[in-house]
């Protein structure tokens, strides 16, 4: 296992090896085409995190329908100011950026560890949009987070670029406060960590964070806020392409034709440029 100094697991060696899986990696995601305003969905400020960093601004849309405990924890710690000043202390090139440590090497908050939320149960209340079936289930989105749902209704997030998740020790029920942001597709991580959201603004910032374990000059989160807590005059308005709209349907068809059997939801970029 690969661990931090305190033993916190981020990725198993096998998972790192799968950074170059036999399945073809997604090409550069196909960006959302020009589309009318009705094809775009505004991100709810109450369900988004604004992360100011030394490299720029990141917005993560939260996914409480997938991981309600993790989302509640992230919001609680954010509102305490817990993440302000935290380092990106473990950053693997072309893979992920891990943060939540202020240099004290405690690796956790004073709150109890969280129960693993590697999967979720799709119900009538789940804000799920299907984009097509696969063997034994269905592919779709919960908000901006790509997911797969089995025939039995059990769903799990796909580890596309921008996905936000929580690391843990050997015991899967030990996620607490730290998180990592994916820089690329990593299908081997599915159902092994709790996914709590996805970057909808600033993936370029995530990829610009200085690499290293630890980096020689680590970047940090200077300030983290729930987007709804940001004064309206300062609050960025973030929109993503609605996967239930016609523009998305065209994007999906175009991308599936281009990628053929190598198609993945990670090939799709829902951010684009909203009107």
Report residues per predicted region.
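Bacterial N-terminal signal peptides
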Residues: 7-17
